[in-house]
């Protein structure tokens, strides 16, 4: 009985595995890359894709796949796309002060190593004279830096956060913890962080900043608002499509602490194109294009022994196909004549009479090759075209020359029919077409084309008052976008859309946008002065709209607000405040029977916001009987420090005295 039950369970499990529905893969959104345009246009036709289907994706200029390549394939699996179609920004050669880099590259691919060294008296981030770092998907494995050797570390001013101690100077190997205010994050992207004092400074410089999201690329056939260089956590961007296009995806995306969510949408055409045509059962078509324009016609034929019912033509109209015909099996039995004769070959006859659907095969004599299908079929009284037998004596000479490319494995004197060569393009040239060319009967099939890259011309940029938004390699691949920005003091014409600043490389040519000088309006006069602080930027009589100045407080004063003020439409933004420190009064401490709890609090200045702790002298206790000892911990507030009061134990109070200041 137990064996029966076990067998039944095994059958259930196996049947469950056999009939489990395979989960298809949805439309992939390639971060910093793209797939072929027709997938975007006919998204609903191609997706979801079935298991084991493959899809190629390409990376934008300045980005590579995780394996360091510009193009890669991903496969649909039961777990989704594998590998995940993502493109990562190449690592740029760092601007290294007090050190050197051993090679002359400007950009490094993912998984590529770079060696750097430091000058005398300076150390790498690992405390060594030389170090090797690797380009990873999120940047360098550690940021190449040469830091001066130190014996102590000074805790920097911490805005929007607090240290766990009031101590300011730390010895090597000392550690300190700090916490950031709501909405701000540590240098490591956390709410709290512990840093260590090393010989070259802090392991990670303490700071609290708002997380930022990467800039957004322009979408094809659409635009978004607002456009910024960088976005902070909480920023929302809305997408719009041009006329005759609609959004596929959410029109609103938001910057979170983990990046943008949801992914950017795409703009798809409404009516101008049709997907591949519907194919009735037992039919075939002659063309196999991926897209069809409005008004295009496709001819449909029925398979052998089937008759067409309805129009053999269907038309693309407003994004939809007209009604296709049906192919119905014919009832009439029609015989064919004897199979046709061919030179230098013969048919393999197996009957005297042949009807609809009957087939006959051919073979060639020795020394001849069969050209065409080796099989013909009787179709309603007529044979399909027979093959030809061609003498097999033609070899191919040198393969065709490809400009800016070459045969990968060297060139032979001659090539036999059926052999092939593989082409590769020169560095930065994009291969279009099949990379394989085959020798067939003395002729080569069409070779690929190597499309020229673009070289950005500095003279043209200076002439048009523009500069590159991002750092690129010396060449930009055909089809990739180059983002420009206007130089400071220049702007696009009011009638020119912002999309003109994003230019596509087209076979070595770049159409440079033109920026003109801004009108002189919105200028500011001298920036406002602040109490207990100074302006450390160089000063001028007038300031352009958008320019800024930086402030610094006097020693021991606490800077509150932004340390920079900006000129906006003729007015300065609010400058920072410099809050006064507190001075410890031993006279007040004596009056109130107080002692310092910690020796390190015996200092001339206590910064705004810092705490200082007291204890009562012997045989005294806090005057406020209902309050615990925590009242003896006081905070400096804009130069004012309140002192608690301790009274002798034999005294009694008939009333509660206020705190003295």
Swiss-Prot record:
Location of motif Cell attachment site in this chain is: 617-619
Q: Boundaries of each Sushi domain copy?
A: 24-88, 89-148, 151-210, 211-269, 272-329, 334-391, 394-452, 453-516, 522-580, 581-647
Q: What is the effect of changing residue 101 to N?
A: In FA13BD; impaired interaction with F13A1
Going by the UniProt record, its keywords in alphabetical order are: Blood coagulation, Disease variant, Disulfide bond, Glycoprotein, Hemostasis, Repeat, Secreted, Signal, Sushi
Xref: PROSITE patterns? SUSHI (PS50923)
Effect caused by changing residue 336 to F: In FA13BD; may disrupt a disulfide bond; impaired interaction with F13A1; impaired structure
Q: Hey, what's the signal peptide range on this chain?
A: 1-20
What pairs make up the disulfide bonds? 25-76, 59-87, 91-135, 118-146, 153-197, 180-208, 213-255, 241-267, 274-316, 302-327, 336-378, 364-389, 396-439, 425-450, 454-505, 486-515, 524-567, 553-578, 582-636, 616-646
Q: Specify the effect of residue 25 to R.
A: In FA13BD; may disrupt a disulfide bond; impaired subcellular location leading to accumulation in the endoplasmic reticulum; impaired interaction with F13A1; impaired structure
Q: Which Pfam families does the protein's record reference?
A: Sushi
Q: Which GO terms describe its biological process?
A: blood coagulation; blood coagulation, fibrin clot formation
SMART domains with a match to the protein in the record: CCP (SM00032)
InterPro entries, per the entry: ComplSys_Reg/VirEntry_Med, Sushi/SCR/CCP_sf, Sushi_SCR_CCP_dom
Q: What is the effect of changing residue 136 to F?
A: In FA13BD; uncertain significance
Q: Does the keyword Disulfide bond apply?
A: yes
Q: What is the effect of changing residue 421 to E?
A: In FA13BD; impaired interaction with F13A1
Which residues, renumbered to this chain, are glycosylated?
162, 545
What's the reported outcome of changing residue 448 to S? In FA13BD; impaired interaction with F13A1; impaired structure
Location of the protein in the cell: Secreted
Subunit organization: Tetramer of two A chains (F13A1) and two B (F13B) chains.
According to the entry, the disease involved is:
Factor XIII subunit B deficiency: An autosomal recessive hematologic disorder characterized by a life-long bleeding tendency, impaired wound healing and spontaneous abortion in affected women.
The protein's role, per its UniProt record? The B chain of factor XIII is not catalytically active, but is thought to stabilize the A subunits and regulate the rate of transglutaminase formation by thrombin.
Instruction: Please state what the protein is called.
Output: Coagulation factor XIII B chain
* Organism per entry: Homo sapiens
Lineage of the organism: Eukaryota, Metazoa, Chordata, Craniata, Vertebrata
């Amino acid at each position: 009985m137990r064996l029966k039950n076990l067998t039944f369970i095994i059958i259930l499990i196996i049947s469950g595995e056999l009939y489990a529905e395979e989960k298809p893969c949805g439309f992939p959104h390639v971060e910093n890359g793209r797939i072929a345009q027709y997938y975007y246009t006919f998204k609903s036709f191609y997706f979801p894709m079935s298991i084991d289907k493959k899809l190629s994706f390409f990376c934008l200029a300045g980005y590579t796949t995780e394996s360091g390549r510009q193009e890669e394939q991903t496969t649909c699996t039961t777990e989704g796309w594998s590998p995940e179609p993502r493109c990562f920004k190449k690592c740029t050669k760092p601007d290294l002060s007090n050190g050197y880099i051993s090679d002359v590259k400007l950009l490094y691919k993912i998984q590529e190593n770079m060696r750097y060294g430091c000058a005398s008296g300076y150390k790498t981030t690992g405390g060594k004279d030389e170090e090797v770092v690797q380009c990873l998907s999120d940047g360098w494995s550690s940021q190449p830096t040469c830091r001066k050797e130190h014996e102590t570390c000074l805790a920097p001013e911490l805005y929007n956060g607090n240290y766990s101690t009031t101590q300011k100077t730390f010895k090597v190997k000392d550690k300190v913890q700090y916490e950031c205010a709501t909405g701000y994050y540590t240098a490591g992207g956390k709410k709290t962080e512990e840093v260590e004092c090393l010989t070259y400074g802090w392991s990670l410089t303490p700071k609290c900043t708002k997380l930022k999201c990467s800039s957004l690329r322009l979408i094809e056939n659409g635009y978004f608002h607002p456009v910024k260089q960088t976005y902070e956590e909480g920023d929302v961007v809305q997408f719009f499509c041009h006329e005759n296009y609609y959004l596929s995806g959410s029109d609103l995306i938001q910057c979170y602490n983990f990046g943008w969510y949801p992914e950017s949408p795409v703009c798809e055409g409404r009516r101008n194109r049709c997907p591949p045509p519907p194919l009735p059962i037992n039919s075939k078509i002659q063309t196999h294009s991926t897209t069809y324009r409005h008004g295009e016609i496709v001819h449909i034929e029925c398979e052998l022994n089937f008759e067409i019912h309805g129009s053999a033509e269907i038309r693309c109209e407003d994004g939809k196909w007209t009604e296709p015909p049906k192919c119905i099996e014919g009832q009439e039995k029609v015989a064919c004549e004897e199979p046709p004769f061919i030179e230098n070959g013969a048919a393999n006859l197996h009957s005297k009479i042949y009807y609809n659907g009957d087939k006959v095969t051919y073979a060639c004599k020795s020394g001849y090759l069969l050209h065409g299908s080796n099989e013909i079929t009787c179709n309603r009284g007529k044979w399909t075209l027979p093959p030809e037998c061609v003498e097999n004596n033609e070899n191919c000479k040198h393969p065709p020359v490809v400009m800016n490319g070459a045969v990968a494995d060297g060139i032979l004197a001659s090539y036999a029919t059926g052999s092939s060569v593989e082409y590769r393009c020169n560095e930065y040239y994009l291969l279009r077409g099949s990379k394989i060319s085959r020798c067939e009967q003395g002729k080569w099939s069409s070779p690929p084309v190597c499309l020229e890259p673009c070289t950005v011309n500095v003279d043209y940029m200076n002439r048009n008052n523009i500069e590159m938004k991002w750092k690129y390699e010396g060449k930009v691949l055909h089809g990739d976008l180059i983002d420009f920005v206007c130089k400071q003091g220049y702007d696009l014409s009011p009638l020119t859309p912002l999309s003109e600043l994003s230019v596509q490389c087209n076979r070595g040519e770049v159409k440079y946008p033109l920026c003109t000088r801004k009108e002189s309006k919105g200028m500011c006069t001298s920036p406002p002065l602040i109490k207990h602080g100074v302006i450390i930027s160089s000063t001028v009589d007038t300031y352009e709209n958008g320019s800024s100045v930086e402030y610094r407080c006097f020693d021991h004063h606490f800077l509150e607000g932004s340390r920079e003020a900006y000129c906006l439409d003729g007015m300065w933004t609010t400058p920072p405040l410099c809050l006064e420190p507190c001075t410890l009064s031993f006279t007040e401490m004596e009056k109130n029977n107080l002692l310092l709890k910690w020796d390190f609090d015996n200092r001339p200045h206590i910064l705004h916001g810092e705490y200082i702790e007291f204890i009562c002298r012997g045989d005294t206790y806090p005057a406020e009987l209902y309050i615990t000892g925590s009242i003896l911990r006081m905070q400096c507030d804009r130069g004012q420090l309140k002192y608690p009061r301790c009274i002798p134990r034999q005294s009694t109070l008939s009333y509660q005295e206020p705190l003295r200041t």
